[in-house]
Each structure stands twice: as structure tokens, then as C-alpha cells.
């Protein structure tokens, strides 16, 4: 089974004019990370009973900006599309990968998952369309309840001393690999998967990762007062510290960090 991208001529009309059945998803709000696609049936369809768990051959599927779509069959991912547009579901074609902005990383994830699932040609009894929110998930506040040790280093003069720092701010994250996010975290949900199911856990892990991330910045001989102005360096250090827990195990990554001035510094050594 595969997806065929609709031609330019098809883009001018409505989905209802082009296909017997079609799936779409309205713009996903900031609190929804994944939502099941809504199935619409037109007068041209013979599937008048409208079984929501079957995707008919020739169905239309729309993907909007800020979304990634997958099709699952019996809980296994069989299609992925991260490029905005309108597509036709074709059961006679090979699986397709429209990776969009995710590039080769998404293709590689799909190939890995596809090896675990061979489609035998029979019509599945549970086929679903899911849409992922690929926009930045905003307004994740954080703060250090306890001081973090920070090594102030000046290699030129051979100086090194440890200070205690506290920091707070806001970060954003993105679903950087929807296939890992689905297979490792949310799975075959009935309707949608929202951020409140994981945000508390993410906040704890984010704060825990600040210690190694700030340690990496200390190696660059940055002083605590300089760090709020080094947002890109801090983001890279945080993603490195969270590589296993977030990127590899959940398919999410830090997008941006806004750090308030670091306060309450005390010299330890």
C-alpha cells in the first residue's frame, strides 16, 4: 500500500470533489501532540456504513503545514508523510515516504520499523490515520529548586573555581521523529495524545540535564552571567545531554531556550 500525491489540478478543488472518502485534521493546538484523523464520507462512496477502522482504496488524505501523518495497520506503521499536500491511498502500490523537513532521519526510522512488519495483502481490520503536531510546543517553564555546581574556568591563567548557580526560564520542544514518538510513547490511541501526559516528566528530565549541559559550557570557559546570551550553545548542550532520553527514546528534541539571568551564586572552592 502507498500514497500517491495528487496532481496540481486536483489541488484546486475540495477533497469532497476528488475522493469518495477522505481524512484530514484541523490545525492542532499547542496542547495536542497527536490526533487521530477524521474520516469524511461523500455521496460517491459505497461505504455508507462508514467503518472508521478501514481505509478504502482510493481514499484521499490531506496533510497540512505543521503536521506529519502516518497510517497504521493493526497498530504497525505502514505509511508516513510529512509534506503538505493532498494524497490518494493506493493499496496496490509500494509504501511511500514523504519525509519533508525531517529528511533522511525519518526515512531511516521508517525502514527500521518496516522490517518488523510485512504486509500480506489482506485488508486490515484496524487501519487508522494519525496526525502529529510538528510545530514548536511552547511555554514550558522550568527552574532549579536546588543550586547547580558550575565550574568557572580560565585555562589561560590556570584558574578554576566552583560556584553554585540557580536558573529558570522557558523552553520549547518539537517532535523531531514522529515514528519514534508513536512507537515508543503514544501508540494506537483512540482519539488524541496531549502534552499534559508527558510534560511533568519532561520538565524533571530537562532540569536534570542542566547539570551536564552547563558543565559542557563551562568547558568552553563561559561564565554564568554569559550563558543567557548563549542560547544556541545551551540548546546544543541540552540536546546532547538529553540525546538518549528524548531524541532516541521519544523522538523529541529541544527547540529553543530562553534563560533568565542566573542568580544566587556562591563560591564553593
Residue ranges of each PLM-predicted region?
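Conserved small/polar residues in nucleotide/adenosyl-binding loops
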Residues: 268-269
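Interfacial loop/beta elements and low-complexity acidic/Ser/Thr-rich segments
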Residues: 1-166, 172-197, 254-256
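Amphipathic, coiled-coil-like alpha-helical scaffolding segments used for oligomerization/assembly
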Residues: 118-150, 203-262
